[in-house]
Design a protein with these regions (language model features):
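Structured alpha-helical
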Residues: 1-102
Length: 102
């Protein structure tokens, strides 16, 4: 598991994600992003199973970026599936203007 040592915010955002699940089916859903940093977040509320290394699109406030899935967990709770994501190098963080202090 990767460990990041950068500032994170305790705030959360509703974001739209899309990509292909582990069966190859396209999906598009709204989930909650928390533990937000300049280069990643923890997504909660996913209803689709993903794989480590999958690349998904994350949209927030009219901006869209690609992230790599670096950690997954089926929470077996109202959080459904959780995924830690990390921003791809060539991308710009979609929530950067929302959390300037991050």
């Amino acid at each position: 598991m990767e460990h990041r040592h950068e500032a994170r915010t305790n705030g959360s955002l509703v974001v739209t994600i899309n990509g292909r699940d582990k069966t190859g089916q396209f999906f598009n859903e709204q989930v909650l992003a928390s533990r937000i940093s300049k280069s990643g977040a923890l997504l909660s509320g996913l209803s689709r199973h993903l794989r480590l290394g999958d690349v998904i699109s994350v949209a927030y406030s009219g901006k869209k970026s690609r992230f790599k899935v670096v950690w997954l967990r089926d929470s077996e709770s109202h959080h459904l599936i959780q995924a830690a994501i990390h921003l791809l190098k060539a991308e710009t963080c979609p929530w950067m203007n929302t959390f300037r202090a991050v």
